[in-house]
A protein has these predicted regions:
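Extended boundary segments
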Residues: 1-16
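Short, charged beta-turn/beta-strand-edge "cap" motif at the junction between a beta-strand
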Residues: 17, 57-62
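Short aromatic-glycine-enriched beta-strand elements
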Residues: 20-26
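Short nucleic-acid-contacting surface segments enriched for D/E, G, S/T with interspersed K/R
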Residues: 40-54
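OB-fold/S1-family single-stranded nucleic acid-binding modules
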Residues: 60-79
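Active-site metal-binding core of divalent-cation-utilizing nuclease and nuclease-like domains
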Residues: 75, 79-86, 93, 97-98, ...
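Nucleic-acid nuclease catalytic cores
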Residues: 140, 144-200, 222
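Domain-level recognition of nuclease-like catalytic cores that cleave nucleotide substrates
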Residues: 186-253
Length: 253
């Protein structure tokens, strides 16, 4: 297995509390400072307080905040959960180029990023295959540690881009043999959890169904995230991604 190695090992710290959508107060070796959160989504259903975290440091004079929170620890083991969605695409590109993802696409001469398709811009074109990668964070599929506090779950509503991308992937099959929707988990799944229905559940459900019928393939990859780097842990093709990851939870009433 190849490892995506960080330029410098990540720094251990503690996320004391989330201050805004993009910032958090962190403690690094007793010093409190503000760090950037590289995701616009919430991190599961956990309270973002006193969470062990891994941070990258960026000595760029143009940056106001020098630290990014790259991962958090929600379990009692060293199963770090990567939260940087920009890093996800770098990892996917790396593992394709290292031929660690040949199960998904094996016949290609280059990996292209940010490729226009229809009215959308998809994440990748691997050889002749269009591929969209998503890093779901609203549900974290790990067994929480004893000190993790949870919050009442909230339904996810930002599904418009995903629906559009699925439709573009399905449409690409008119001229291409293959199209892939890839879920990227920057951690090892240890406990599968149900998601609440999104606020646009019916539209999302129908789009997944139509895309699968058109021939779009659904895959997921898990990773082993460490302070030094990231290793691919598993590659799985899902015959019924929608039911397995977007099913409704039982009524809470």
């Amino acid at each position: 297995m190849r490892t995506y190695v960080f330029e410098k090992p990540l720094i251990r710290g503690t996320m004391l509390k989330r201050k805004s959508q993009f910032t958090a107060l962190v403690d690094i070796d007793g010093e409190e400072l503000i760090a950037h959160i590289p995701t616009t989504n919430r991190i599961g259903d956990v309270e973002n307080k006193n969470l062990p975290c891994l941070l990258s440091y960026h000595d760029d004079p143009k940056r106001k905040l020098k630290y990014d929170i790259e991962a958090v620890l929600l379990s009692d083991d060293e199963n770090w959960v990567g939260i940087n969605q920009i890093l996800s695409n770098k990892l996917v590109e790396y593992f394709f180029n290292e031929h660690e993802l040949d199960e998904i696409v094996s016949d290609f001469d280059r990996v292209q990023r940010e490729v226009n398709l229809g009215i959308s811009k998809l994440d990748f074109k691997v050889g002749d295959t269009y591929l969209e990668a998503k890093t779901p964070l609203t549900t974290i599929n790990v067994k929480y540690g004893k000190n993790i506090k949870t919050l009442p779950p909230k339904p996810f509503s930002s599904t418009g881009r995903m629906v559009q991308h699925l439709r573009e992937l399905a449409g690409s099959l008119k001229d291409h043999e293959k199209a892939v929707f890839l879920q990227v988990f920057q951690y090892r799944i240890t406990e599968k959890k149900k998601r609440l229905r999104s606020t646009h559940y019916e539209e999302v459900s129908q789009t997944f169904k139509e895309s699968a019928e058109a021939g779009v393939e659904f895959w997921e990859i898990q990773m082993d995230f460490r302070p030094e780097g990231v290793t691919l842990y598993s590659v799985t093709k899902s015959a019924d991604l929608f039911k397995s990851t977007y099913r409704a939870t039982q009524d809470q009433s």
